């Protein structure tokens, strides 16, 4: 099939716009947190796999960290195990942790690996327990009301926070032309398993690798101002101001704090991108306009 003149011109424009970005990012590492709608639509899933394979083909090193909250919730429901959340975190007792490991490590992770490989990549699936990739400790959660003289410690079970990343393993895989796909399960000092927020794992992996970019796929268009307009480029100082004045609040706060910590920890830029947009990852990396919000220590994309 021959392209029309208009279609050919559009293809040429896209390729020429992408070329400077490809040159800039060759040999660089990009950590992508994959989740939300992008994991549910078959079209978006295929597009994500193609994006990752193309990045690797042009010399960029993608590392994928994935979520799987809805899939965990579905299996818990089928097993008649009730889900409880505190401050957005799933209370994870021993039975729930078994389900988390089954779903994230055994189902979701392998589905993503298989999808990338079917589109021409060489993906390898890992959990944080493999070669102690993600070392973790129990997350301490506290709560205090005006009536309390001291904070109350709340036990949320096998929920963890990252204490270390096996950078040597990831570098070995990346140099071997593999695409690491990581399930956010950490391992404690005694071999115990921890359920960790995927955004936090992605941020810590990006920091440890000194990645060029941390990309967080979400179900929103990006960070918005109080008028509902997407803020396309922000410095870390501007983000802190938006938190202070209440523009950023609620469920977005943990994600934004994760992005801020990554940039302050050595990642060149963090991106909050709309995973509902087909090929969102490529559009954010390889076009002038992008499809989300970029956070960096600089003012511009």
Curated annotation (Swiss-Prot):
The keyword Cell inner membrane does not apply. One of its GO terms (cellular component) is cytoplasm. InterPro entries: AceGlu_kinase-like_sf, AcgluKinase_fam, ArgB, Asp/Glu/Uridylate_kinase, Glu/AcGlu_kinase, NAGK-C. It catalyses: N-acetyl-L-glutamate + ATP = N-acetyl-L-glutamyl 5-phosphate + ADP. Its main location: cytoplasm. SUPFAM superfamilies: Carbamate kinase-like. Keywords: Amino-acid biosynthesis, Arginine biosynthesis, ATP-binding, Cytoplasm, Kinase, Nucleotide-binding, Transferase. Pathway: Amino-acid biosynthesis; L-arginine biosynthesis; N(2)-acetyl-L-ornithine from L-glutamate: step 2/4. GO terms for molecular function: acetylglutamate kinase activity; ATP binding. Catalyzes the ATP-dependent phosphorylation of N-acetyl-L-glutamate. GO terms for biological process: arginine biosynthetic process via ornithine; L-arginine biosynthetic process. Belongs to the acetylglutamate kinase family. ArgB subfamily. HAMAP family: ArgB. This is Acetylglutamate kinase. Signal peptide: none annotated. Its EC number is 2.7.2.8. The record marks 33, 255 as: Transition state stabilizer. The keyword NADP does not apply.
């Amino acid at each position: 099939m021959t392209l029309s003149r208009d279609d050919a011109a559009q293809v040429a424009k896209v390729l020429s716009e992408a070329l400077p970005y490809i040159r800039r990012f060759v040999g660089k590492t990009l950590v992508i947190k994959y989740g939300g709608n992008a994991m549910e639509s078959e079209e978006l899933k295929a597009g994500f796999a193609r994006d990752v394979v193309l990045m690797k083909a042009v010399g960029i090193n993608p590392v994928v960290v994935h979520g799987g909250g809805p899939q965990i919730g579905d299996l818990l429901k089928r097993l008649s195990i009730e889900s409880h959340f505190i401050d957005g975190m799933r209370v994870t007792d021993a039975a729930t942790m078994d389900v988390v490991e089954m779903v994230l490590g055994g189902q979701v992770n392998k589905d993503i690996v298989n999808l990338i490989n079917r589109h021409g990549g060489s993906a390898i699936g890992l959990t944080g327990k493999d070669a102690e990739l993600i070392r973790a400790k129990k997350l301490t959660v506290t709560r205090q009301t005006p009536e309390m003289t001291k904070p109350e410690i709340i036990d949320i079970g096998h929920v963890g926070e990252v204490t270390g990343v096996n950078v040597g393993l990831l570098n070995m895989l990346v140099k071997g032309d593999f695409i690491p796909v990581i399930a956010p399960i950490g391992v404690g000092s005694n071999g115990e398993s921890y359920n960790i927020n995927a955004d936090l794992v992605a941020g810590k992996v990006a920091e440890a690798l000194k990645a060029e970019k941390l990309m967080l796929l979400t179900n929103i268009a990006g960070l918005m101002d109080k008028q509902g307009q997407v803020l396309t480029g922000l410095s870390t100082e501007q983000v802190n101001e938006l938190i202070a004045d209440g523009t950023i609040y609620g469920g977005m706060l943990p994600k934004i704090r994760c992005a801020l910590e990554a940039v302050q920890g050595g990642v060149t830029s963090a991106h909050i991108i709309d995973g509902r947009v087909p090929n969102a990852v490529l559009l954010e990396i390889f076009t002038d306009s992008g499809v989300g919000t970029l956070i960096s220590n600089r003012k511009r994309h």
